[in-house]
Amino acid sequence: MESKSYTWFERRRRTKALDLAQEQITKALDTVTLLHQATKKMAENKRKEAMQYIENIFKVEKEVDKLRTEVFKELSKGVALFAEYREDLMHLVKRLDTLADHVKDAARCIKMLGDAEIPKEFWENTAHTTSFLVDCAHALRGSIEKIAVDSVAAIEGAKKVEDIERKIDDEYLKTKALFIKHGREVDSGSMVIFDDLVEFIEHAADMCADTADYIVILASRE
């Protein structure tokens, strides 16, 4: 997984809170890549490999939670940053933590569906959707990096996130349509869980877009 240095943070006085926040944001976005790899492996019927990615998601998400707690602990000391930037940092950390939560919930659904008989088209569509989610996360990562050094680029990156999120909305509807096409081939329990999987991926995309909206606000201040 790649590790980035967010220039917006570099312009502030180096603190433990900023170091922890950078790591938390990076790991939260990394969970999206792991989810895509898991859905790809399910589409290829490589279930054992898919489950390895799922376990990695659970591991990374726990690290994200731990880092969030440590960031808030540092920020509560009151001297980590000026109040305005402390608030900005908390909002970013909360949003990315929620994103990782949605990815974890999607991963749980995949784990439950590990032995279920699911049409290949379901997994192929889902893998296609998560590929867009990876694009969304990469655009979000780039936008965060540009907040301080190039506010125009940061805003453009945020708009790119929203454009990709709309594509995910389209894929969401296509996948839902498969429920009708293959309804008689899938047992009701598996269908309910797959529906949850699709919803959690959509929630993750929505959180990317929500974070992008907040980045526009931050970049406009710079």
Task: For each feature predicted by the language model, list its residue ranges.
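Cytosolic, long alpha-helical scaffolding segments
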Residues: 1-222
